Amino acid sequence: EVEIKAVADEAAAERLILSLHNELKGFKKNATITSFDVKILTALQQHHSHFKRGLLVEIPLGEYAIELAQQYGCCQIGWKDQLATDEIIKLTHQAKLDISVWTVNDVERAKYLQQLGIQGLITDVPSTMLRSLCL
């Protein structure tokens, strides 16, 4: 997963996407480009990029975030932990989008999210999570 930070404008997004295509040539089938910035997702879509895409969500958009992800051809959503409610995870699954949750440092919370069927977890304590979640 490659997270792309926000860019100033559409032209910057296009330049960045063209650069990514060159720099990540060998990873086009494996890499997922994620961003909070829809300008990045728009540029990926307009360039018919082979990279998988993911929308990162840090503000409470609810179901609208799922609609945005689908609109931009995303295969996943990365929810901020506080936004990853049971209901939003259920709706994201129903939309057939993979789910990652960030930043989860509490083991019990991570176990609960794992039981809900999320596909990815971003944490500041990876060793602890690997031991505790039996991964």
What are these regions (language model features)?
Residues 1-135:
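Short loop-to-alpha-helix "cap/lid" segments that border enzyme active sites
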